[in-house]
Each structure stands twice: as structure tokens, then as C-alpha cells.
């Protein structure tokens, strides 16, 4: 009798283990599908490039946060631009194919505007620019072994593992997007997708790239939350 009970328990363990594995794979496919189909959200983006020369350093970049819609591309955000160790507050808008920038320079308000490139190729387009949204990275969701999985209630976080093979995959995706060469750079990354297993929706996308070489270092961070929220510009 005891052997029969142990046999049943072992069988249930195998079945439940299989279900759990399938559940993880299913969630990863939902994440991939949702990421490809994301329509809008609250985007936060930051780029900081520091160059050191003759005992001095120069910071160039920006940080921005606001609501964004992707098709057609529309944006309403605010933040700062950094240049030559000075920072300028900015407001950014994209509407009807035109990019508007409001900046405060030397206590004066200055407006600029320019057309958005064909195909919505714009530095503030999260869906186009974020490493987490590139095809080569999204395809890594097809293999659950690429991801560390943590659960907090209904929230499931998938974090891309740190291996030499995956680092090369991230490099390849970034080089394909930017055409920059990274052979001589120290390179690190964070890529996460947060999924709600109850609503079966992706809740947040996070990525960070760090690369540096002698005399320069660059950090790129971005995130998207409140995914598919209504956005009015």
C-alpha cells in the first residue's frame, strides 16, 4: 500500500512539474506577444555619456519621462538635457509627425521643431529604441533557460541571465540597431519583463546597458509601464 501511495505521489510530482514548466513557457510567449503589440505607456529614458580627457570630464545626454503612443508616434514628456557639464530643462512633444522641444536656456524659453523621420525612427521612441524591444532580444523569450524567474504574488519577473553567450546576443542586437562597434568595451546589461499572471498582461519593461572603454563610459536606461494606457497629446 505504501509503495502504491509513493507511486501516486511521484506521478503527481512529475505531472505538476511538467505543468509548471509549461506555465513558464506560456507566460514567456505572452510576454513576447504583448511586447510586440504594445501600443502606449509611460516611458522613462536616460542616456549618459561621459568622456574624460586631461583630468577633466564632459557629460552628454538626457533623461526624460512621459506618456507615449507608438502608432502613430505621439509623445508628451519632460526632463533634462546634459551638455558640456550644463543641464537644461526640457519639454518634448510629438504630434502629427512633428517634434517640438521647449528648453530653458539662460533663463530664456526657446522652442524648436522638426519633422519626425519616416517610419517613426526617433531617439525618444521607446518601442523603436529600447534594447528590450529588439527582435533579437524578444526571440530569447522562446527559451525559458535564458531567464531567471522570480515571483511576488501575481507578479512574475523574467530577468535575462548573465552568460557569455547571452551577452554576445545582447551585443549583436545593439550593434544591429546602432551599427556601433563594441569589441573593445567592457559591456553589461539588465533586461527585465514583469508579467501579471492573474490578468495575463505585461506590466513593465526595463532595460539598462553599460559599456565603457579607456576614456569614456555610457549608460542607457529605459522603462515602460502603465502599458497600453490612454495617451492624449
Describe these PLM feature segments.
Residues 30-34, 63-70, 92, 96-99, ...:
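Extended lipid/amphipathic-ligand handling interfaces
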Residues 1-8:
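Positively charged n-region of N-terminal signal peptides that target proteins for export
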Residues 67-128:
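An acidic-aromatic
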Residues 45-49, 79-83, 102-106, 206-212:
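Beta-turn initiation residues at beta-strand->coil junctions
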Residues 160, 164-233:
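Gly/Pro-enriched, hydrophobic low-complexity segments
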Residues 105-165:
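Flexible, processing/modification-adjacent segments and terminal tails
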Residues 56-64, 85-91, 96, 186-190, ...:
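Short, surface-exposed coil-to-beta transition loops
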Residues 6, 15-70, 74, 229-233:
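N-terminal leader/targeting segments and the immediate start of mature chains
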Amino acid at each position: 500500500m505504501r509503495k502504491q501511495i509513493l507511486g501516486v505521489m511521484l506521478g503527481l510530482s512529475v505531472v505538476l512539474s511538467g505543468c509548471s514548466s509549461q506555465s513558464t513557457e506560456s507566460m514567456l510567449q505572452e510576454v513576447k506577444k504583448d511586447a510586440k503589440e504594445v501600443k502606449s505607456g509611460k516611458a522613462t529614458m536616460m542616456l549618459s555619456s561621459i568622456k574624460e580627457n586631461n583630468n577633466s570630464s564632459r557629460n552628454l545626454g538626457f533623461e526624460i519621462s512621459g506618456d507615449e503612443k507608438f502608432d502613430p508616434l505621439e509623445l508628451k514628456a519632460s526632463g533634462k538635457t546634459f551638455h558640456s557639464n550644463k543641464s537644461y530643462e526640457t519639454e518634448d512633444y510629438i504630434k502629427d509627425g512633428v517634434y517640438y522641444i521647449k528648453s530653458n536656456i539662460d533663463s530664456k524659453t526657446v522652442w524648436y521643431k522638426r519633422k519626425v523621420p519616416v517610419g517613426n525612427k526617433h531617439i525618444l521612441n521607446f518601442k523603436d529604441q529600447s534594447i528590450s524591444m529588439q527582435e533579437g532580444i524578444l526571440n530569447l523569450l522562446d527559451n525559458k533557460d535564458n531567464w531567471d524567474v522570480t515571483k511576488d504574488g501575481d507578479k512574475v519577473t523574467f530577468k535575462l541571465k548573465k552568460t557569455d553567450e547571452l551577452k554576445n546576443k545582447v551585443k549583436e542586437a545593439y550593434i544591429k540597431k546602432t551599427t556601433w562597434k563594441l569589441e573593445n568595451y567592457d559591456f553589461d546589461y539588465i533586461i527585465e519583463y514583469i508579467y501579471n499572471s492573474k490578468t495575463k498582461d505585461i506590466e513593465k519593461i526595463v532595460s539598462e546597458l553599460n559599456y565603457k572603454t579607456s576614456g569614456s563610459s555610457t549608460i542607457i536606461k529605459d522603462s515602460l509601464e502603465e502599458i497600453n494606457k490612454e495617451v492624449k497629446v
